[in-house]
Amino acid sequence: VAGAARRRLDAELVRRSLARSREHAAQLIAAGRVTVGGAVATKSATQVETSAAIVVSADADDPDYVSRGGHKLAGALAAFVPLGLRVEGRRALDAGASTGGFTDVLLRAGADRVVAVDVGYGQLAWSLQSDDRVTVKDRTNVRELTLETIDGLPVDLVVGDLSFIPLGLVLPALVRVSAPGADLVLMVKPQFEVGKERLGSGGVVRSAELRKEAVRTVAARAAELGLGVLGVTASPLPGPSGNVEYFLWLRAGGPELDPADLDRAVAEGPR
């Protein structure tokens, strides 16, 4: 594009919160984990357009994050930040924080504060429990969240990795504690959306059509609460049993789920 703004690739990775520093960006590039427009990048100094499609692939063996789940959210941010999702400076809620993979990713991407909520107790990694930017809310049922539960301050970014419950049951509570204009980036787990009787062997949803139905079900419930869909992408890593999972980016007043975007997310995601 004539006149399009350009920047060094390493600097652009940092600007998009896909790398913590230019040195970290160089490590990602050297590991072959960065693609620009679908092509693997090899040089930090490569000039790229600031609108370019840049993706950092997850590395399941990378010990960087406190849990494997961090790579899942990192993949979602790689898809959504170029489309306008902002993490930096925001007060966030991590619903179903567990050991804190999502919380870890949010802090590295510049979140101001993270409220880490989980029904369990003592699971959050010590490095996060002892971080002044993290408020730990253990033994807390996400369905029962109120502003009082999270110290009276609404959040403007919600991320969620919840198991054994359809997302439609927790969406009202997440909306209740969100500020106007908040972004919700939630993992859709088809195995908890389609009903036990429709699961394949090992509890895995193998049908692409069923997985699409799961995403559509969550999007429809979100629409009832006034939330539209700004993005949908497959998680770069499957769930523990091999279930393919998806992220929905929701915001009040956003558009309806685009069927073409959903088809693309399913086609490009893990099989």
Tell where the protein language model's regions lie, with residue ranges:
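A basic, amphipathic helix-loop patch mediating RNA/tRNA/ribosome contacts
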Residues: 1-52, 91
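Glycine-rich SAM-binding Motif I of class I
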Residues: 100-101, 122
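Conserved S-adenosyl-L-methionine
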Residues: 105-113
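S-adenosyl-L-methionine
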Residues: 115-165, 169
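A short glycine-rich, Lys/Arg-flanked "PGG" loop and its adjoining helix->strand segment in the class I
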Residues: 168-185
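Short, glycine-/aromatic-enriched active-site segment of Class I SAM-dependent methyltransferases
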Residues: 190-207
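Flexible, glycine-/basic-rich loop-and-beta segments that form/coincide
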Residues: 244, 249-271
